[in-house]
Every structure is written in C-alpha cells, then in structure tokens.
C-alpha cells in the first residue's frame, strides 16, 4: 500500500496564491511558468517571472506584492523542506544554488532546459498520482532527486560551475541554520556565530565570502532586516516592542539601524499613533 502520509509532504497545484501563507511555511516552492507573467517582490527586491522561467523559493514569506497577468499559467510543486533534504544528492553544489536563489529565485531557461524541466515536473506528478505503486515513496524520492539534479545543471549552465569544499559547505550550512532559527534577533555580531561554530570570526567571514560572494555581516543583517520589514508591514508591534523583540540596546539605535538598511525610519512605517501606544 502507498504511504498516505506522503500527501502532506508534496502539494501540486496551478496557483501561487498561497506561496506566502502559513499553510506553506516549511515548504519549498518550485514553479514553472507555462505562459504569461507575474511581477513580485522577494527579499526586498523586485522580480519578473515569465514564460519558460523557473522559480524556486525557499522562504515563501519573503514573497510580497504579487501582480499576476490574466494569461498567467503556472505549474507549482510545493515540497516539504525535510523531504527535499532527503532527496537532495550528496553534493556541495546545493549550497551554492541555495545562496544564489536567496538573492534571485528566478532562473531563465532556454527551450531545451524548459522542456526538460517540464518533463521533470510531470514526472514528479505522475509518481505522486500513482498511489497503488508498491515503492510509492521511493519512486517519488527518485523523481524529485532527478528534478533537483536538473536544477543544479541549469544553475551551473547559466551561472558557471564552481565547487565548494566539504568543510566550507558544512560551516556555511550551520551558519545559515542559525540564522534560519532566528539567532540574529539576539546576536548580530560575527564573533558570536564564529564562537558557536568553533572557528575565528575572520575564518567565518572568509568562508562566507568564498561561498556566497558576501560577508558574514551581510547575511546577519540581511536576515535581520527582512524579519524587521515583515513586522513593520504587519504593524503588530509598537516601535518600542520591536526594538525589544530584536534586542536592540535602545529604541534610538533600532531607529538608526532601520534607517540605515531600509532608508526610512520605523516611526514612519508604523505611524505616530502606534509609537505612542
């Protein structure tokens, strides 16, 4: 019998309307544009997602301001992040791709790549729908793994193949895991992360620079400001509450931090009335 529990690990749909919803938290979104286009903001930047483009989003909550054309058609496969980890080939290339997709989730595919990618999507769907197959979960895992390998190949073709040493990959993975867990809310010094990873701050910065092209400080501040931006949009906390939530030494320092990285004061975003609560 098929493993019925697998149905909560993969969701296949023709819409991106729920990509930023709580329902999809913990899922990776893989979307292939069949026709039309969509405009959206991600990670604080504006992107276009058009015909024959592939989009891979690790954190759907960072997607905002979606504007979808009337002729937009898309095939979407949401996969539980833990299941993706089980399916991902033992290759350090995944780290390079993960960092690149965090900065730009859209990959432009040529005709041959699009045809192959569409075949991969249909392959996953076929295995997902074949409930009576004895090796149901294993077959889906293989289909997803093949799709991921093609993603790696697309990325290497478009952006160049550069390998990362196993040691660098392990440390970078642990560093990003700490940021994913929200450590930046209480710790924004490189020395803290370096100490937790049992390396020097200089070595951690060197690893970040070589694997991602950005410093450790960049990633710490990037995660911090994206989280702050999300709370500012929701307007669920006051100015002082947000300063405390992110463990800033004072509201004044919090204000300067937001001004520096967002180009606006938090009081303007939250509103004067909110600040006086």
Describe the role of every protein-language-model region:
Residues 1-53:
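Generic protein-terminus/edge-of-domain signal
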Residues 39-41, 62-70:
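Short beta-strand His + acidic residue motifs that chelate non-heme Fe in jelly-roll/DSBH
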Residues 49-62, 78-81:
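Conserved metal-binding segment of the jelly-roll/cupin
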Residues 52, 204, 253-254, 258:
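Short hydrophobic/aromatic patch on the recognition helix
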Residues 68-129:
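A hydrophobic/aromatic-rich effector-binding and dimerization subdomain
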Residues 132-138, 152-177, 181-197, 210-218, ...:
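Short, Lys/Arg-enriched, Trp-marked, Pro/Gly-tolerant hinge/linker segments that flank
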Residues 210-249, 271-277:
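Terminal helix-turn-helix DNA-binding modules in bacterial transcription factors
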Residues 256-277:
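…primarily DNA-binding HTH/wHTH and HhH modules…
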């Amino acid at each position: 019998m098929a493993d019925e529990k697998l149905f909560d690990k993969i969701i296949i749909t023709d819409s991106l309307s729920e990509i930023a919803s709580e329902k999809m938290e913990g899922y990776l979104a893989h979307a292939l544009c069949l026709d039309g286009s969509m405009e959206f903001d991600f990670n604080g930047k504006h992107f276009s997602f058009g015909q024959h483009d592939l989009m891979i989003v690790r954190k759907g909550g960072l997607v905002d301001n979606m504007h979808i054309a009337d002729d937009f058609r898309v095939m979407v496969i949401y996969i539980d992040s833990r299941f993706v980890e089980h399916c991902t080939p033992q290759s350090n290339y995944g780290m390079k791709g993960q960092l690149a997709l965090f900065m730009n989730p859209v990959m432009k595919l040529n005709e041959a790549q699009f045809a192959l990618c569409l075949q991969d999507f249909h392959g996953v769907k076929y295995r997902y729908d074949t409930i009576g197959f004895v090796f149901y979960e294993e077959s889906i895992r293989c289909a997803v793994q093949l799709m991921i390998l093609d993603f790696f190949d697309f990325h290497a073709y478009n952006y160049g193949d550069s390998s990362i040493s196993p040691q660098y990959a392990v440390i970078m993975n642990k560093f990003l895991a700490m940021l994913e867990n929200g450590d930046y809310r209480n710790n924004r010094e490189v020395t803290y992360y370096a100490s937790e990873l049992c390396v020097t701050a200089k070595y951690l910065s060197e690893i970040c620079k070589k694997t991602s092209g950005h410093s450790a400080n960049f990633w710490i501040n990037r995660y911090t400001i994206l989280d702050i931006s999300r709370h500012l949009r929701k307007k669920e906390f006051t100015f002082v509450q947000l300063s405390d939530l992110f463990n800033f030494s004072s509201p004044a320092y919090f204000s300067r931090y937001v001004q520096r990285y967002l180009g606006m004061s938090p009081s303007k975003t939250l509103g004067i009335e909110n600040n006086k609560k």
